[in-house]
Amino acid sequence: MDSMEAVWWGKFCVWGTNKHPPLSGFPAYGIYLLFSENIKAVYILSQICITVGFCFIYKLASLLLEQRKAVLSVMLLEGCVFYGFCSPEYNVNVMSLALWPAVAYFFYRAVTENTLCLWCLAAIACAANFLNKYTAAWQLLGCAGFLFFTPEGRKMLKSYRPYVALAVFLLLIFPHFYWLWQHDFMVIEYFSSRSGGVYGQEMPLWENVLHHLISPAEFLVSMLFYGAGTLALFFAFSRSLEPEEIDFGSRRFLFWLGLFPLLLVLAYGLISGSPVK
């Protein structure tokens, strides 16, 4: 159903929908036309997204680890449900599997090499990720956190290049926000329905507190379950590998773009009590 929905969005080539930003529909409709309007072709697009994501993960890992471990970092993801069982059906989540690693890769190269070209590529990747799904904001906040709260990031802010990248990012997402303004920000209604149910009802204080605790706990347990295969493979292989020395700047980068978005999601669930996915 998500695949058909994406094709339908792409057919009308608009800058927004009632649920998500518009980007996922464009390639879906494009490949649908390329294969003579065969809806099965959209499932090929899912695997293209997975492959692109693997490529960027390998390229990023190769900047931090030796080649053998960089390859292993990609292979371990085959144990994750999102890269296997959930991957055939094309939707915004599958496209995110390509775009999140792309943002991390280009942003890492931008802050380490500080060239205008790389900053612009990072901005384009960030805009594409946001125009695919609003939850990309968690990763964008991680990028901002790295720039403002680390020595490496603050050093970059003394250059004009990050500000050019910010301008490129805002320019790319402006049409979508203009569309939202024209349509009275109709996507808010979808968000409200997703966070409705018992979470939107009046309840005793103790029950309300319990819901606020359950929401992030359920999310964390589900993520551990979905990634159980990857974790098992990691512990199996890690015994035969020597520890890798990673500099403090790279460790801070991995925290802000790897762990920090997860902490934000958990904090959102804890504060709002709404289901997080």
What are these regions, as identified by a protein language model?
Residues 130, 255-276:
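Transmembrane-helix signature of polytopic, lipid-linked glycan biosynthesis machinery
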Residues 1-6, 16-31, 36-40, 93, ...:
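Extracytoplasmic catalytic/substrate-binding loops of multi-pass membrane glycan-assembly enzymes
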